[in-house]
Amino acid sequence: MALQGWRFFGVSATIIIYIGGVLFLSMNNIPGSHPKRPRIERFAEFPSFHSPRFPMPSRKMTIRWCRDLKYINRDLPIYADYKSDFYTALPSDVSAALQSLPALTALASFPGSGNTWLRYLLQQATGILTGSIYKDYGLLKTGFPAENVCNSSVLLVKTHEWGSKAWAPFSKAILLVRDPEKAIIAEFNRQSGGHIGFASPDRYKRTKGKYWQQFVSNKLKGWEMMNLSWARNFTGSIKVVFYDDLVHHTERELRSILDFLQFPINEQLMRCAIMRKEGIFRRKKRLLSFDPYTESMRAEVQNRRRIVYGLLGRQEP
């Protein structure tokens, strides 16, 4: 009898525990019965990280071209790898085709001088693709499908190189020159944040500022060598364009460049190019809360600029 009583008690306890558990779970699942768990934001320290105003790098940027872009001559085989293919013996029919095309023109500049922006303007004003001795995948996907094309099927070819081997493919050149103080910062931004991004303030202060100081010293020498070697030693026709003139007198400079290239001006395309001149490849201004140049650095930059500008026939203001 006692055994049956214990069995009855055990079964009853099990049923009570089961019913209690069901009621507890039901109450916790009723909407509004408990506060919502706060949402954890990724990259919360960057409130605009996912904002449409600041597109993710992987998002494809689209450009409204004034006209569909094309090659000057689609029938010409594209020998795209400059370093490995340009100096090899080409088939006779390709060599003949190259010789029958207009002279190959370089768009030479020190990095950070506005080369990409000028290419963008010229593609808008002509509808013709521009090439490059490099293969920048970022540019390849965002408006420059002829990256790494280095022959006269394109309007001109971008280069940041100098010296006899760099000059060899070209019979004409446009030398784009920018104030070294601004060009060096633009190149520092490009290496840190891409073609339209910026370097964080912390990058200027790496290794207690020694990294930035060495960067300026190296790039200033490169800026001087790049501009003077092309201006003095290139044996073909050369036109010097100053970035500041391109910014303040865009249409005048574009017309002058197209005249140098002996490319007919389409007035409708020119108006369209000027209307869309900003594009996405001209880095917007950003004011730093500090001056990255020390007094001695700025004095050296200004001295080199004065010497180079004087040799290029540019009068300092």
Curated annotation (Swiss-Prot):
Mutation: N148R; reported impact is: In strain: ZBMEL157
| Taxonomy, superkingdom | Eukaryota
- Protein's membrane topology: Single-pass membrane protein
Q: Which cysteines are joined by disulfide bonds?
A: none
The portions of this protein that span the membrane are 8-28
**Per the database entry, which stretches of residues form a coiled coil?**
none
Query: Quick check: keyword Repressor in the entry?
Result: no
GO cellular component terms, semicolon-separated: membrane
Q: What is its main location?
A: membrane
Q: Which residues are glycosylated?
A: N151, N227, N233
Q: What is the effect of changing Q214L?
A: In strain: ZBMEL186
Q: Where in the cell is it found?
A: Membrane
What does altering E147R do? In strain: ZBMEL157
Keyword set, alphabetical order: Glycoprotein, Membrane, Transmembrane, Transmembrane helix
Give the similarity note.
Belongs to the WSCD family.
- The name under which this protein is listed is WSCD family member CG9164
Record organism: Drosophila melanogaster (Fruit fly)
